[in-house]
Amino acid sequence: MKTKGKVVSIIANLVTVQVDAPVAQNEICYIELGGVHLMAEVIKVIGDKVYVQVFESTRGLTVGCEVTFEGHMLEVILGPGILSRNYDGLQHNLETMDGVFLKRGEYTSPLDLKAQWNFKPLANAGDHVRSADWLGEVTEGWLPHKIMVPFAMEGTYV
């Protein structure tokens, strides 16, 4: 179950949230504002008060807005195709933006999820694998990308 909270104060892009359960430093949350979800990161926790930095304009944000904490940290997505794109600091694809800025609450995929790559297996079916083990690789241009087991996974490779 995701932790919930409510905005209790706003100073520019620094927002204070009262939470109903513990959250972690650097955890990602989304603040609901008229059907748009503003991404923010926890920068300080003091008891049930959490200070978050909002990465977008807070114009229109009010005390009482609902906040949902995702239970994970700010992450980047790595994979083939990453070298052929331009990103901002949150890994939004700058080439797909309509204008100079993204619209509030709009997020782009950092990778082309429809692109197909030639996969060369490095693990064999039946191998026991754990986080960070190499499963295989794909080549982007001249650079091989290693495909690894995600950090929270372990098991038999099929």
Predicted regions and their residues:
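Peripheral, non-AAA+ core regions of ATP-driven protein-machinery
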Residues: 1-158
